[in-house]
């Protein structure tokens, strides 16, 4: 399943699948076993991958052909233990999956140039997110709003930059 996030200062009035993107957020820790998640990611783009591995072990989990692409395209590579973040905030498996995506939202805004390019500081960003969460989750209670905000903030704070290793590193 593919999900798309289109972020812009002004309202976007077009709805379509995207073929060329600035960032890929991958919530599937086994993605490299069944597809190429880097297809369509522009040179210098951002790739965020679900992983709870320590940073020094991540590169070893990437198959060589994808390591080459990460290096050649100068892709900025990050990991996020989004599912672990979600599990801290809800015992419900269904909600954990949704909240995992919420943590990736935070990671996206931390790693992309969107906030800087639009002159949005962190306080303004958090206020805008809180306003949207109140609209979306307010009828469910303040604790739901708060937990969703905490998950998003954890994604923002806990995303890890992964340095490119060597193509021939042990896998």
Regions found by a protein language model. Give the residues of each.
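Active-site cofactor/cluster-binding pocket
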Residues: 1-171
């Amino acid at each position: 399943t593919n999900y798309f996030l289109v972020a812009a200062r002004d309202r976007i009035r077009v709805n379509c699948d995207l073929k060329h993107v600035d960032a890929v957020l991958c919530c599937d820790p086994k993605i490299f076993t069944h597809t190429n998640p880097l297809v369509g990611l522009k040179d210098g783009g951002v790739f965020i991958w679900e992983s709870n591995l320590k940073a020094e072990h991540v590169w070893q989990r990437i198959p060589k052909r994808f390591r080459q692409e990460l290096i050649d395209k100068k892709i900025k590579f990050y990991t996020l233990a989004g599912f672990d973040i979600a599990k801290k905030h809800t015992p419900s498996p269904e909600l954990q999956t949704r909240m995992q995506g919420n943590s990736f939202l935070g990671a996206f805004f931390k790693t992309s140039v969107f906030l800087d390019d639009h002159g949005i500081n962190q306080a303004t960003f958090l206020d805008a997110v809180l306003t949207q969460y109140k609209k979306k989750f307010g009828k469910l209670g303040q604790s739901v709003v708060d937990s969703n905000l905490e998950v998003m903030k954890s994604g923002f704070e806990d995303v890890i930059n992964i340095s490119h290793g060597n193509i021939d590193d042990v896998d």
